[in-house]
Amino acid sequence: MRHYEIVFMVHPDQSEQVPGMIERYSATITNAAGTIHRLEDWGRRQLAYPINKLHKAHYVLLNVEAPQEAIDELETNFRFNDAVIRSMVMRVKHAVTEASPMVKAKDERRERHDFASEANDDSEAGDSEE
Protein backbone atom coordinates (compact mmCIF):
# COMPACT_ATOMS: atom_id res chain seq x y z
CA MET A 1 0.00 0.00 0.00
CA ARG A 2 1.06 3.55 -0.63
CA HIS A 3 1.44 6.41 1.82
CA TYR A 4 -0.64 9.57 1.45
CA GLU A 5 -0.86 12.97 3.07
CA ILE A 6 -4.41 14.30 3.08
CA VAL A 7 -5.47 17.82 4.04
CA PHE A 8 -9.04 19.00 3.92
CA MET A 9 -10.62 22.30 4.89
CA VAL A 10 -14.11 22.51 6.32
CA HIS A 11 -16.50 25.46 6.15
CA PRO A 12 -16.12 27.44 9.41
CA ASP A 13 -19.86 27.25 10.15
CA GLN A 14 -19.57 23.44 10.11
CA SER A 15 -16.68 23.20 12.63
CA GLU A 16 -18.81 21.27 15.11
CA GLN A 17 -19.21 18.48 12.52
CA VAL A 18 -15.44 17.97 12.14
CA PRO A 19 -15.06 15.21 14.79
CA GLY A 20 -17.78 13.18 13.05
CA MET A 21 -16.13 13.73 9.68
CA ILE A 22 -12.74 12.65 11.04
CA GLU A 23 -14.33 9.52 12.50
CA ARG A 24 -16.11 8.70 9.23
CA TYR A 25 -13.03 9.26 7.05
CA SER A 26 -10.81 7.32 9.48
CA ALA A 27 -13.28 4.42 9.37
CA THR A 28 -13.16 4.47 5.57
CA ILE A 29 -9.38 4.01 5.69
CA THR A 30 -9.29 1.39 8.44
CA ASN A 31 -12.15 -0.64 6.91
CA ALA A 32 -10.07 -0.89 3.71
CA ALA A 33 -7.17 -2.40 5.74
CA GLY A 34 -5.38 0.95 5.82
CA THR A 35 -3.42 2.57 8.64
CA ILE A 36 -3.57 6.11 9.99
CA HIS A 37 -0.05 7.21 10.93
CA ARG A 38 -0.86 10.80 11.93
CA LEU A 39 -4.10 12.70 12.49
CA GLU A 40 -4.02 16.39 13.37
CA ASP A 41 -6.95 18.74 13.82
CA TRP A 42 -5.45 22.20 13.30
CA GLY A 43 -8.68 23.99 14.10
CA ARG A 44 -10.02 27.15 12.52
CA ARG A 45 -7.34 29.15 10.73
CA GLN A 46 -7.11 32.20 8.49
CA LEU A 47 -6.99 31.42 4.76
CA ALA A 48 -4.25 32.90 2.59
CA TYR A 49 -6.92 34.09 0.16
CA PRO A 50 -10.73 33.99 0.17
CA ILE A 51 -12.37 30.77 -1.02
CA ASN A 52 -16.09 31.08 -1.81
CA LYS A 53 -16.09 34.44 0.04
CA LEU A 54 -14.77 32.74 3.20
CA HIS A 55 -11.72 34.00 5.07
CA LYS A 56 -11.37 31.16 7.60
CA ALA A 57 -11.62 27.38 7.48
CA HIS A 58 -11.19 24.39 9.80
CA TYR A 59 -8.09 22.39 8.78
CA VAL A 60 -7.52 18.64 9.24
CA LEU A 61 -4.34 16.71 8.31
CA LEU A 62 -4.11 12.93 7.87
CA ASN A 63 -1.08 10.80 7.01
CA VAL A 64 -2.28 7.36 5.99
CA GLU A 65 -1.23 4.14 4.37
CA ALA A 66 -4.17 2.89 2.33
CA PRO A 67 -5.15 1.12 -0.89
CA GLN A 68 -6.16 3.20 -3.90
CA GLU A 69 -9.84 2.23 -3.51
CA ALA A 70 -9.98 3.87 -0.06
CA ILE A 71 -8.37 7.05 -1.40
CA ASP A 72 -10.83 7.15 -4.30
CA GLU A 73 -13.72 6.77 -1.85
CA LEU A 74 -12.32 9.57 0.33
CA GLU A 75 -11.96 11.91 -2.65
CA THR A 76 -15.54 11.15 -3.68
CA ASN A 77 -16.74 11.88 -0.14
CA PHE A 78 -14.83 15.17 -0.15
CA ARG A 79 -16.30 16.14 -3.51
CA PHE A 80 -19.93 15.50 -2.49
CA ASN A 81 -19.70 16.92 1.04
CA ASP A 82 -20.70 20.59 0.85
CA ALA A 83 -18.96 21.32 4.17
CA VAL A 84 -15.54 20.45 2.67
CA ILE A 85 -14.46 23.56 0.78
CA ARG A 86 -11.04 22.31 -0.35
CA SER A 87 -9.07 19.06 -0.14
CA MET A 88 -5.71 17.76 -1.29
CA VAL A 89 -4.38 14.21 -1.43
CA MET A 90 -0.65 13.79 -2.06
CA ARG A 91 1.30 10.58 -2.34
CA VAL A 92 4.44 10.53 -0.17
CA LYS A 93 7.36 8.11 -0.17
CA HIS A 94 7.34 7.18 3.52
CA ALA A 95 4.97 7.23 6.47
CA VAL A 96 5.15 10.51 8.37
CA THR A 97 4.53 10.06 12.09
CA GLU A 98 6.21 13.03 13.79
CA ALA A 99 4.21 16.13 14.62
CA SER A 100 3.83 18.74 11.90
CA PRO A 101 5.45 22.19 12.26
CA MET A 102 2.00 23.62 13.04
CA VAL A 103 1.57 21.35 16.06
CA LYS A 104 5.19 21.77 17.18
CA ALA A 105 4.81 25.56 17.21
CA LYS A 106 1.55 25.28 19.14
CA ASP A 107 3.18 22.97 21.72
CA GLU A 108 6.14 25.35 22.12
CA ARG A 109 3.79 28.27 22.74
CA ARG A 110 1.89 26.19 25.30
CA GLU A 111 5.13 25.20 27.08
CA ARG A 112 6.31 28.83 27.20
CA HIS A 113 2.93 29.89 28.57
CA ASP A 114 2.98 27.10 31.19
CA PHE A 115 6.54 28.02 32.18
CA ALA A 116 5.60 31.69 32.50
CA SER A 117 2.54 30.76 34.58
CA GLU A 118 4.66 28.62 36.91
CA ALA A 119 7.20 31.44 37.28
CA ASN A 120 4.41 33.87 38.18
CA ASP A 121 2.93 31.40 40.67
CA ASP A 122 6.35 30.91 42.29
CA SER A 123 7.00 34.65 42.58
CA GLU A 124 3.54 35.25 44.06
CA ALA A 125 4.09 32.44 46.58
CA GLY A 126 7.44 34.00 47.57
CA ASP A 127 5.81 37.40 48.02
CA SER A 128 3.10 36.04 50.32
CA GLU A 129 5.62 34.30 52.61
CA GLU A 130 7.41 37.58 53.45
From Swiss-Prot:
* Start-end of Basic and acidic residues biased regions: 104-116
Disordered: where is this region? 99-130
Gene Ontology cellular component list: cytosolic small ribosomal subunit
DNA repair among keywords: no
| Keyword Ribonucleoprotein tagged | yes
Q: Which UniProt keywords apply?
A: Ribonucleoprotein, Ribosomal protein, RNA-binding, rRNA-binding
Task: Please list the GO biological process terms of this entry.
Answer: translation
Sorted alphabetically, which Gene3D superfamilies does this protein's record hold? 3.30.70.60
Q: Where is the composition biased (Acidic residues)?
A: 119-130
Q: Name one Pfam family in it.
A: Ribosomal_S6
Recorded GO MF terms: small ribosomal subunit rRNA binding; structural constituent of ribosome
- Superkingdom: Bacteria
Which InterPro entries does this chain map to?
Answer: Ribosomal_bS6, Ribosomal_bS6_CS, Ribosomal_bS6_sf, Ribosomal_S6_plastid/chlpt, Transl_elong_EF1B/ribsomal_bS6
For this protein, the record's NCBIfam families field holds: S6
**What is this protein for, i.e. what is its function?**
Binds together with bS18 to 16S ribosomal RNA.
Q: Which family does it belong to?
A: Belongs to the bacterial ribosomal protein bS6 family.
User: Would you tell me the protein name for this molecule?
Assistant: Small ribosomal subunit protein bS6
Species of origin:
Yersinia pestis
